[in-house]
Amino acid sequence: MGANIVGVDFSEEAIQTAKSLNEELGLNAQFCCCNIYDAPIMLKGQKFDIVYTSYGVVNWLPDLIQWGQVLSQMLKDGGKFVIVEFHPVLWMFDENFSQVRYAYSRKEPYIVEESTYTDSENDNRQKTVTWNHGLAVVLNGLLNNDLQVQSFGEYDYSPFNLFGNMAAEKNGTFKVAGKNGEIPLLFSVVAVKPSK
């Protein structure tokens, strides 16, 4: 038996890395490189018992109502959606966590253009477009698509040293140094598509 697993990412490099790990571990997962909004079509209407989303996904998505619609389309009746994601409060601060620089939630994207290490030769610039969605936007993306929230959690730690200046904890997680758990860094949601 076993689970049928399909991974979706918009990055071909991430998909190639996942395929290599899949082969190395002797697993039988499949992978699809596409925009998440196109996933129901690209996966030919497949439905799943569980759809899981983890760290660093929501900030790339402009429309969370459409995202919730995709999740609902991809879940079987009675299926669960699980997300563990960086908290929107985290993205309000500068990299030193010393001052608030960005909005908690806004419809307009943040657009950052950065020079690459070869900028002086070819004027190479990389544009990054992200959104900071507040928790109400995330939850309404689910609720407006008939997904029922079963649990919600907030956590004051991160699995990664996001900005290079976070304090390492004994359990391998990271917290904002000097803030003693004052800033939420992660949130989690479990939502279910009702059975008909």
Language model regions located:
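Core SAM-dependent methyltransferase catalytic element
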Residues: 145-147, 169-196
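Class I SAM-dependent methyltransferase SAM/SAH-binding core
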Residues: 1-41
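A short glycine-rich, Lys/Arg-flanked "PGG" loop and its adjoining helix->strand segment in the class I
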Residues: 65-80
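A short SAM/SAH-binding and catalytic strip from SAM-dependent methyltransferases
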Residues: 49-65
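Conserved class I S-adenosyl-L-methionine
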Residues: 80-115
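Short alpha-helix
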Residues: 118, 128-152
